[in-house]
A protein has these predicted regions:
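The feature marks the mature, well-folded catalytic cores of soluble enzymes
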Residues: 1-247
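Intrinsic-disorder-associated, low-complexity terminal segments enriched in Asp/Asn/His/Tyr and depleted
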Residues: 253-254
Length: 254
């Protein structure tokens, strides 16, 4: 079926990667000396291949940490930030009748577990700073709460997500699953939604983000987590049922 709105798959061509840089006022502070080299390594690998958008409070500090790189491929935007999870607080790219749009949903720290007053404004600030191409149309999607890691698209009208996350307390608990489904189908131009009904992970602050459980690898392939350790608490938990749902309930995936 043709769609006016298309939510691209993970493998769709992109113009840049966005990173939100760790600093001493984030939760990474106690292990910042370990985290910064990791982000530097990620940044350098991205810069070798495409443009990199870095959101940070202090551009000078990040330049010192990066050292010698091709800065022609780096776009800096200075602003206050709470944390580093750009996949969750960042804008979600769609095409509406071919026009690129950037959806800006509410990000509230995974159901108000953590401070997100700055991160919730990042996409809006980036648009005000004219960071994106002039053809990109920003769209305010408030008051709906949605993190990028909570949805997965095959780019062909199918979206995968979890029941546990989208309707959780302090997100969109005022909506029934049927209402959530209608809304998501409308704004993302979907034919169907694959709801994972399991997905417990010990220590997970996201309430079962689908990107920690199952991912589309192609239009007909889903990769999912699986626990093989019989001593692990996940071996007989709901998490083990994720694979069964992926294998038995949905087509045309393998």
């Amino acid at each position: 079926m043709e769609h006016n709105v298309i939510l691209p798959a993970e493998w769709y061509p992109q113009s840049a990667v966005q990173l939100t840089w760790p600093h001493e006022n984030t939760d990474w502070a106690p292990i910042l000396d370990e985290v910064i080299p990791c982000f530097v390594a990620i940044a350098k690998e991205v810069i070798k291949r495409e443009k990199l958008l870095i959101v940070c409070p202090d551009e000078t500090a990040v330049r010192e940490q990066l050292g010698e790189v091709d800065y022609d491929r780096v776009i800096f935007r200075e602003m206050d930030t709470n944390d580093t999870w750009a996949r969750d607080h960042g804008g979600i790219s769609v095409f509406d009748e071919g026009t690129p749009m950037l959806y800006d949903f509410v990000f509230n720290g995974w159901g108000m577990k953590f401070a997100a007053n700055h991160d919730n404004l990042i996409t809006r600030n980036l648009c005000h700073m004219k960071t994106f191409s002039g053809e990109v149309v920003p769209a305010n999607m408030q008051p709906f709460v949605l993190e990028g890691g909570s949805i997965e698209s095959d780019g062909k009208g199918t979206l995968m997500t979890t029941v546990e996350c989208l309707a959780s307390v302090n997100r969109n608990e005022y909506l029934q699953q049927e209402e959530l489904e209608r809304y998501l189908k409308d704004v993302f131009g979907l034919d169907r939604i694959l709801w994972i009904t399991s997905g417990y992970l010990a220590g997970d602050d996201t309430d079962s983000h689908v990107d920690t459980l199952a991912r589309f690898c192609s239009e007909d392939t889903i990769a999912y987590v699986r626990c093989e350790d019989e001593e692990d608490e996940h071996y007989r938990s709901e998490e083990r049922r994720v694979g069964k749902e992926c294998r038995s309930r949905w087509s045309p995936y393998h």
